């Protein structure tokens, strides 16, 4: 995990602090947190709370519903992990906290953060935080729950499954967190989320966290949240600070050659290349590897073991280029990515923000390069308008920008 002291916090004016009770708390020591939780926070490498952590943790610990929005790479996972852990009673080995994530990779990563921060609270219960995701045996899920899990982190489909089977007892649940809430409440997941709510205690605390919070999602929350504290970002503040955004005008048949030229021109620490389809990802990775550019690729139809291996080699730096679909656009935490390339522009505005957030995480500088065909121009203009930003054409002396 990156040192939180190196985060360049969002400016306070970026937030719509329009509700009483929201004020930045600049130090973890000034928050109402258990001493053993503070030990876990500092041992995990956190130094100073980021802007979203300064605003969201204390309202979370009060027990009320909360809707919190912050840009990618600014510490959302840390914010809800700390708030969640403070709300639990570790004297009782019953399931008290549930975190739902849209992908298994994000669920595994979140569970790792919660486990590390909660290490001293758990006092020897190494299985206090368990994951429930597809691609694993249901019998293993049973064993995790019987071992005394206090926090469950999972994907909606698997959580629905183990709950319906009676393996996951929900009567003692205190807190539900929806990570990447806009995705979780989209059509693909909404039905499963509502199914899970059928099993939850009526008075459960609900917390929503995401980089984007569209109006239709906020409208949906009225169905299952009670007078939530809202910590939202002004739309004009949603473009990621520290990430320079460019476009290259190129037609489809010349994209590959343009990408090759780009990699021969500049020195890149690590990069993520996004394409819109599984077939395009496989094809692009094959073409790059054949041209002696060592790359790895990942998409949702790959076996889970292969996806985990790809992410592991990319995280530890063995692989420097990852070609993928939007599968990793949400929250996958790789610290040394300095360039994100949209080989295909995303199909919606929210995905753009999640994608370019892979570069420049935790205050580091990053670059986003968009390949734009003639038919993409209107989409690019919509992105600029939506985020009140300007995406310039890639300069000829681009290589010099990486050294700044």
Swiss-Prot record:
A motif (DEAD box) lies at residues 179-182. Residues 1-28 are annotated as: Disordered. Its EC number is 3.6.4.13. GO terms for cellular component: cytosol. The keyword Nuclease does not apply. It comes from the Eukaryota. PROSITE patterns: DEAD_ATP_HELICASE, HELICASE_ATP_BIND_1, HELICASE_CTER, Q_MOTIF. It catalyses: ATP + H2O = ADP + phosphate + H(+). Keywords: ATP-binding, Helicase, Hydrolase, Initiation factor, Nucleotide-binding, Protein biosynthesis, RNA-binding. SMART domains: DEXDc, HELICc. A motif (Q motif) lies at residues 26-54. Residues 57-231 form the Helicase ATP-binding domain. It is an enzyme of class 3 (hydrolase). SUPFAM superfamilies: P-loop containing nucleoside triphosphate hydrolases (SSF52540). One of its GO terms (molecular function) is translation initiation factor activity. ATP binds at residues 70-77. Residues 242-402 form the Helicase C-terminal domain. CDD domains: DEADc_EIF4A (cd17939), SF2_C_DEAD (cd18787). InterPro entries: DEAD/DEAH_box_helicase_dom, DEAD_box_RNA_helicase, Helicase_ATP-bd, Helicase_C-like, P-loop_NTPase, RNA-helicase_DEAD-box_CS, RNA_helicase_DEAD_Q_motif. eIF4F is a multi-subunit complex, the composition of which varies with external and internal environmental conditions. It is composed of at least EIF4A, EIF4E and EIF4G. Belongs to the DEAD box helicase family. eIF4A subfamily. ATP-dependent RNA helicase which is a subunit of the eIF4F complex involved in cap recognition and is required for mRNA binding to ribosome. In the current model of translation initiation, eIF4A unwinds RNA secondary structures in the 5'-UTR of mRNAs which is necessary to allow efficient binding of the small ribosomal subunit, and subsequent scanning for the initiator codon. This is Probable eukaryotic initiation factor 4A.
